[in-house]
Amino acid sequence: MIKHYIFDLDGTLLDTAPDLARAIQDTLIAFGLPPVTLQETKTFIGGGARQFVHAALKGKGDDHLFFEKFFAAYMIRYEAYQLEVASIYPGINKVLKTIQQQGHHAYIFSNKPHDLTVKLIDHVFPKLFTGVHGHVPGTLPKPDRTMFDRFALRHGIHLPDSVFIGDAPPDVLMGQTLGIPTIAVTYGYTDRAVLASYHPTKIVNHANEILEAVKSIK
């Protein structure tokens, strides 16, 4: 029986693309660079903040000093904007409360910077998660399992009773690296065909399908 539900954050629990888009747009404009569209922004999400900024710079971030200056400016803006527009996907609150009512545990393992992840979750989902982990500088992001293994040990996550839920290839690959079932959600930032090419255990189109998908896992 699945007792440990490990969620991605951006594109899985929250639609954070508008906040990310505003922060990157303002930073690009401040540096005299061409803007990117909201749709483009969505395709950059999933690999962590530094990968996101590299993608938005479209090759202009190859200079290390320039990239670090730009990245610092972006992070200041994103920290200021991240609580303004982010919205909970329909059905997510019910999923999380059901997990809690069943005596099971929900966790977040995200490539978003750790401090911002904790701040956002404390604001939007107080007391619904047993553990929250974001990316820490100097460590490898998902799908590397090094930090997850430490996280799992700290929170008593038993992998045979676990499932990984997310909207992007790193989430599916993370679950596969851990040897646990994966549920890919199509309402986030990755096309269904792309998700299917990574062979998740289940694919769902709406948050209200997540728990039924978990029940159907053999």
Where are these regions (language model features)?
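Asp-based, Mg2+/Mn2+-dependent phosphohydrolase catalytic module
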Residues: 1-3, 39, 100, 114, ...
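Residue-level recognition of specific faces of alpha-helices
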Residues: 74, 91, 95, 105, ...
